Amino acid sequence: MTKGQTSKMEARKKKGKAAAAQRRQRPLPAGWIQGDFLPSTVTEGDLLELVEHGLLAHKSWRLPADNEVEPAPREGGRVLLLSHVHRGFSLPPHPFFKGIMIHFGAELHHFPPNAIAHLSAFIVLCECFIGCPPHWGLFKHIFSARSQTIKRLSQSDDKTHLLQLCGGLGFQKKSWSSYPALQLSESVRNWQSTWFYCQDIACPNASTGLPPFSLDRPAPPKQLALSKAEKNDIQPLVEALVDVVRRGGGHRY
C-alpha cells in the first residue's frame, strides 16, 4: 500500500469514528426494549481492519444505511457483529458452530459475545490441545444452556418469558467440570450496535453458512443432558481435558 493510500485510509477511519460517535449519542429508537438491536455504529474503518487481518473477505461487506434502526439484509446477505468476529466468529462458520445453531434453531445474534468466546475456546481446546474434532458429548459435559428473558420495565409489570432477541441464548460452565474458567467481561456494552452486512459463505457440503436472517426471537433452549452411552463415550476425552489442565496448557486459549 502506498503512502497516499495509507493516508486516505486513515482519513476514512477518522471520519468514520466521528460519525459513529454521533450515532452513539442518538436516543433509543421508539419502542426499543432490552435485547433489541441498536442502530449500527460500525464504520468503514472497522471493517477495513477486519479485512486487513484476514477476518473478513475483501468486498464482501456492506455498511448499514444511516436511517436503519435494525438489520434488513439484501438477498444472499447476512448480518454479522463486530463483537462476535472479535471473539472468534468468521464465515464460513465452523461446522461445530453450525451444528449448535441447528440444535437450538438459533441465529448468530441470538448468542451474546461471551457465548461466542466460549465456543471459540472450546473448539481450540479440542483441536489444538486434546487433538480431536469438537465433540458434542464433551461440550454437553462442560456446559449447560441458559436463557435471558426480557427485563421488566418496572416492578409492577408482569414477568415475561420472552427471550431477548439479541443474546437470548448462552452457555454456562457446569460447576463440576474441570474445564478452566475463562476470564470474560460480565457484559459487553452496546454490542447490539456492532452489526453490519456480509455476503454469506457456505460451509463445505452445504448450501449456506449462516441461516437467512430473521427478527424472530430464540426459543427456550433445550437442556444439554448426557445419555449413559454418551458419558461412557466421552470418558477418554474428559481424562484428556484433566491432563491438559494439569499440565497448564489449558488456561490461555
Where would I find each of the regions flagged by the language model?
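Residue-register detector that marks a fixed positional context within folded domains
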Residues: 1-253
